[in-house]
Amino acid sequence: MKDQGIDCLLLGNVGNPILDYIEDIKDNTKLVIECSSYQLEMVHYSPHIGIILNLFEDHLIYHVHLEEYWNSKLNMFKYQNTNDYMLYDSESVNLNNMVNSNNYQSKKIDI
């Protein structure tokens, strides 16, 4: 994105805490944010474009049940509308089943 001249920031679990960059965010700044399942557990906002690559079964230290973990990850799509995009791997059986069992409003794109 930067190579294309787009003002953007890579934030979140990639080592750049969002609050450390809050003053760098302008109206036209595009944000790429990596979030963990426990960060997504109680979100009340969805991104315009959300990407989920996979669901792993190794996050049960924090989450009691596997379905709780998966639902937390999919929370990022909960508030999307028909103008938003969900990118996901439909070849992941668990992820595909979870996506298709919910009534998400966003446009779904298989990656």
Q: In which residue ranges do the predicted regions lie?
A:
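Compositionally biased, intrinsically disordered low-complexity regions
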Residues: 14-17, 52
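Active-site catalytic pocket residues across diverse enzymes, especially alpha/beta-hydrolases
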Residues: 1, 5, 22, 102
